[in-house]
Every structure is written in C-alpha cells, then in structure tokens.
Amino acid sequence: MSPSPFAPTIETIDYPFPPKPIPLSDAEKADYKARIKQLLIEKDAVLVAHYYTDPEIQALAEETGGCVSDSLEMARFGRDHPAKTLIVAGVKFMGETAKILSPEKTILMPTLEATCSLDLGCPIDKFSAFCDAHPDHTVVVYANTSAAVKARADWVVTSSIALEIVEHLDSEGKKIIWGPDRHLGSYIAKQTGAEMLMWQGDCIVHDEFKANALRDLKRVYPDAAILVHPESPASVVAMADAVGSTSQLIKAAQTMANERFIVATDRGIFYKMQQAAPGKTLIEAPTGGNGATCKSCAHCPWMAMNGLKAIEASLSDSDKTTHEIFVDEDLRVKALIPLTRMLDFAKTLNMKVKGNA
C-alpha cells in the first residue's frame, strides 16, 4: 500500500540517548540483589520486568516471585498480584499502563527517564491534531504509547492481536488511523488490505535491522531460521521464516525444528528465548549495515537504564517523585476504554493478548 498523501512526513529525530549505567562489581551486584530482595518484602512490592531488560534484571524478577513478559502482561500480572506496590522495570509507558489497570496500587519505576522512541515520536498534541483532521477514521494505536495517546484512541492493540482487530474493523468498512509504528502498520496493512493512514514513528532498535547485512549473515548460517519482530523494516520482514510479537518469537524458537535462529529484535529477549529453547543457538540479526554504525545495536538504551542500583533506589528513596507513576484520573478512565475494548475482543477470540514490545 502506498503512503497516504495525508500522512505526516517522516522526520529524522536525534533522540537523546541516556548514559549507560556504570558497571558494578560482582560483590556490588550481590549486595544490591540482597538489598532489593529484602526491600520487596518490607514494602509489600513485586518486581516485573520486560523481555528487553538486561538478563540479570529478568532473573531477579523471577527469583523474587515477579514476572518477565511484555508490557500488557506485566501490567495484568501486577493488577492480579496481592502486592500493594509494583516495581516496573521497563520504560515509562509500561508504568503508565500498569497504573491504568491498577489505580489503587503504587507504581514505581527504577527511573522515570526511561522512555521509548515510539512514545517520543508520537506527541499527543500533534497526534490529536492528525486524528482531528480525519474524523471519519477509527483511531488504532499500538500499546507502545503514552496514556494520553491511548486516551485519544478508539482501540489499543498489541502486536499479537493487531491483525485480528484491524481485519475486524476493515470488515465493518472502517477507515483506520494507525499509530505510531510505521513498520508494524505497513505490515498489518499489507496482510489485511485495510485502508490505513500511518503515523510515521518507529522503534530505534528494530528500525536499524538491515536486509543486506541479514542476507550476508544468512549465507554464513544457511540452516538458521530468521525470526523477525514486525516493528522491523519491510525488507527485513520479507526475509523472515517467522514474524511475530515477543512471546510469539519465543514460541517459534521453542517449536521450530531448526537448531539455529537469527533473531531480529532486542537482544534482551535472548534470556527467555534460551530458557524456552535450551540447546539451540541464538544469533543477533545485524544492525547498522556491515559497518559499526548502529546506535542502539540491538538493545534499547532506555531499557538498559533499569539497573540494580536504580531498582534499589526506587524502593529505598524517601522522595518517590523521581520514581512514582501518576496518571490523571480522567485520563486514566479514558485510556482504559480502548484497552478494555481490546481485552474484550480477545476474549471473543479465546486468545491471550501478549506481544507488544
């Protein structure tokens, strides 16, 4: 499908990458882990971590009775868990989603500075104006968005259910505004044939995967299956043996007969993917072409901010304003409507909704 003449133009944004956490010694790591475990008990808190956080953070979440998953499942786990406080190791929109589903709970994050290029690239004022210019369109937004953008939408979707929802809306003759990920939107439009106006955002990690370099790597490992997240460019998706959400890619590595996999998504997923597929070889898909020109290099710089020191600080700091997530109640109620609409639709399909990045 050719780009709509009414779609916003693609702007090159120089995102302000955060500094990487200072490496800790083994002794410091052990001390922080012990302190965090004690504080979780004292504060009646549970730690949930996204697939893209560093392996030691995912392991700590599992060791302490928390969970490792995609952002929506993290929020649902926190909602259903008896703990009064939820520590969200991820990026800011994930904390907001948790607060939308659990307004009565305290939602803390290791740092409120951990954001997302999809969130930054879809400011509510510009996106709302875009929607207002096309009032006859149904607004569908990816879960990787702010609470304000969700509140402006008719539907919120994850990558695991986006195809089904767009097919449903298209069957009803609905014209669709899609935001913010242009690659995922283009993939869905191609699969469904739906008429969609695209917001022109992208994930800095997935946007860097390169088809030519991937083709070269495939020549080195001809027996490897290529697993691709649909936030990747169309030329990369076209080379995939399996395309899917985070949880769907983990399942593919577990169930496919191949012994090797080239994986085009954030390398943080390797922790859970290796658990699900022990003995199989996982290979990073190339970013930035054949030269050392990548910026994210297959790992989200904001996810990397969720270090042990920051998690300990979120539990021990007396000043919670640097860690606590707040969502205006009117905004929360509005954002809950399209989220609930998705969850109710999933029930009609008898499927568990997972898979936003």
From Swiss-Prot:
Keywords: 4Fe-4S, Cytoplasm, Iron, Iron-sulfur, Metal-binding, Pyridine nucleotide biosynthesis, Transferase. GO terms for cellular component: cytosol. It is an enzyme of class 2 (transferase). Its main location: cytoplasm. It is found in: Cytoplasm. [4Fe-4S] cluster binds at C116, C203, C300. Its cofactor is [4Fe-4S] cluster. Coiled coil: none annotated. It catalyses: iminosuccinate + dihydroxyacetone phosphate = quinolinate + phosphate + 2 H2O + H(+). GO terms for biological process: 'de novo' NAD biosynthetic process from L-aspartate. Binds 1 [4Fe-4S] cluster per subunit. Iminosuccinate binds at H50, S71, Y142, A143, N144, S159, H229, P230, E231, T246. Gene3D superfamilies: NadA-like (3.40.50.10800). GO terms for molecular function: 4 iron, 4 sulfur cluster binding; metal ion binding; quinolinate synthetase A activity. Pathway: Cofactor biosynthesis; NAD(+) biosynthesis; quinolinate from iminoaspartate: step 1/1. Its EC number is 2.5.1.72. NCBIfam families: nadA, PRK09375.1-1, PRK09375.1-2. Belongs to the quinolinate synthase family. Type 1 subfamily. Catalyzes the condensation of iminoaspartate with dihydroxyacetone phosphate to form quinolinate. This is Quinolinate synthase. It comes from Shewanella sp. (strain MR-4). The gene is nadA.
